[in-house]
Amino acid sequence: MALLLTWPLEAGHKIVLAECDPDGGAILPGALQGTMANSHGLRNLALAGRQGQLGEAFWRQLVDVTDAGSRDRLVLPGLYDPAHASSLGPVWEQLANLFTGIEQYQHDVIVDLGRRGAVGPSSVLAQRADVVLMVTRNSLRGLQSAQVRLAALRDQLGGAAQIGLVLVEGGPFGRDEIQRTLQAEVVAVLPWQPEQAAVLSDGAEQPRRFEQGELMRAARTSTTRLRQMIATRRSRLGQPAAGGREASGAR
């Protein structure tokens, strides 16, 4: 959510956060506080995908999360029941194709794949992403888990994938030490700010100067490096540098 709300938008452009975690989404009951029940979201694309209508149905499932109703920062809510993931087998590939070409509609997309979505059937979304991000705490427990997940990601995605780390502070290990140990770039370091984070995860009341707080400032700063990574990859592949597709590989 922090990236969605801070991503820089050119005139006429929009950004989508797609919750594609096979273990279920968190935005509807969390940030949106259950205000939309389960009327929109990923589950509704299963039937559309089987009928060859996913390209049209996708846009109807997006939810505006801006206060002004500008519809330039949108969410595709995830599954409310993980059991529904089994019906999405053919949908992942169709979504990947849609996201790959989404720039023609002046949209960028951030894909949240949760803890295990970057492997298995939904991994095609990570394979097609410009940048894959793994979120981890800078504690020993967090980094041990990250090391195992990074190895699995690299096996799944191959050597050409751009994999970066997002660190959540709270442990003793520094950025440089983590980069050396895990052999991955730390793209962003987010401060441990539970009160500010609760606004994004649970729809809590915003504290004073939330937009200028440490958490949102750190998220905003990270977008600069992310856009550089996207441009570098696209230059290497001979693609336009604007916009991008990002996937979160783990949380």
Regions found by a protein language model. Name each.
Residues 8, 91-94, 141-145, 211-218:
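Helical mechanochemical/support elements of P-loop NTPase systems and associated helical scaffolds
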Residues 94-99, 103-191, 198:
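Conserved catalytic-core segment of NTP-binding enzymes
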